[in-house]
Amino acid sequence: GNFAITEGAILAGCRFFAGYPITPATELAESMSLRLPQVGGVYLQAEDECAAMHLCIGAALGGYKAMTATSGPGFILYADPYGWALGCETPLVVLNSGRVGPVSGITGAPGQGEFYLMRYPTQGGNFETICLAANSAQECMAMTVEAFYLSERFRMPVSVLADQLITDGFEDISVPENEDEMKEMGFRVWPREVCRGPDFYPATDELDIPPVVLGHNTGALCSDWTPTEEGYDIEEVEAHHKHAYRLIYKVRNNKHLFNHLYEKKYMDDDPDLVVVSYGTPSRVVNTAVAKARQQGLKVGALRLINVWPFPDEHFTRRTKYLVVELNWDGELVREVQRAAPKDSEVHFLGSCGDLPTLPALIETFEKVIKDEPLTRKGWELEEW
C-alpha cells in the first residue's frame, strides 16, 4: 500500500514530500525518498510531523504538488499546520495510516481511531474537511490521485485514511502508463497550466474559478488570521463571516464534484440488515455478507469511501444497521446513528487491534436480525 501511494502521488504530479518516520507509514517516506529524485522531485525528512506539514505548505505556496504522511500519533502534531492550510486554502495531500491506540498502541496492529480526527484535525471550527478511505493497494494509488485532484479543485488539504494492514500489505496493482490509461481508469488530474490566476478571490461558495492559484512566479500573500479579499489581516466580524462561509460551503455545496463511482454497495437488494464499514474491515464484511446470504440471511453491505463530508444520503433507508469498526469506543457508529432515520436500529461491533472473524460476523448478523443481545469476548457491547 505504501508503494502504491507513492506511485499514485507521482502520477498526480506530486514533486515534493516531507515527513517524519513512523510505523506504519515509514515505507512511504522511504519509497518517496527513492522515487521523487528519479522524476525531478524533492524529498525532505523533517525534525517532526509539525515541521513536515509546514514544509509541504511552503512547497505548495511555491507551486509544488506536495504531500506528507504519518500515523495517528504523528497526525496529532499536524493540528497547527493543518489549520493553517485550511484557512489559507493551500492544496496538499495527507496520508494517515491508522494503528491501534490510544497513544502509541501497537505499531504493527491496525486501528481506526482517527475517524473524528480526520473531520476535526485542527482547532477553531468553521471549516469543512475532505477525507477518502481506501481498502486495498490499488485504491491507495487511485485515491491518492483523486486526493490531489480534490485538493486543487477545492483549494484545501485532503486526507487519505488507511490502516496498517493496507499500507504494510503487498498486493498487485495496475499502474496506468499514460494519460489515456489514467482517464480509462477514472483518474482525474488538474494539469498545471490551468492552475494560474490572481492571489485571492471574493468570499463565495462558487467554484467557477481556477482551482488553485499557486506557483505563478508572483509570490503568494497568505495569513492565518481572518483575511481581506486581498489577503491582509483584518479583525472584522463581517469579513470573518465571508471567510468562514467559503471554507465550509465551498465543500458542502459542491459534493457533486466528488467521484461517487468509488462508493460501494454490495448485495443491497432490500436487506433486513445493512452492514456499514470502511477500510480493511470492509473486505472481511463483504465476504461475511456473501456467506450469510448463502445461508438465507438478507444482509447487505455499504462501504464508505468519501467519509468526510459524511455521506448522509446513503442512510435514508429505514432498516437495521450494523457498524463494524477497528475500535471499541465507536466512532463511525455515532455518525450512522445521527444520519439514519430515527426509527432505525443502529448496532455496533468493534474490534481492538484485530479483525473480526467470519464466524463472529455471521453470528452477529443473525443476532441483530433476530433481536438478540450482542456479546463478544465476554464483553457486553453497548447498544447505540
Protein language model annotation of sequence segments:
Residues P24-E27, A52-M53, F75-L77, G101-S104, ...:
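Flexible loop/turn segments at secondary-structure boundaries
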Residues G1-P121, E128, Q164, I362-F365, ...:
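Thiamine diphosphate
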Residues E89, S97, V103-V175:
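Core active-site phosphate/anionic-ligand binding loop and the adjoining beta-turn-alpha structural block
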Residues I10-G13, S33-V39, L95-S97, T122-E128, ...:
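Gly-rich Lys/Arg/Thr-decorated short loops/hinges at beta-loop-alpha junctions or inter-strand turns
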Residues C14-F16, G41-L44, Y64-M67, T90-V94, ...:
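Structural motif
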Residues G1-N2, E152-W384:
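Flexible, low-complexity linker and terminal segments
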Residues S31, L55, D80-P81, E146, ...:
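A short acidic, amphipathic alpha-helical/loop segment
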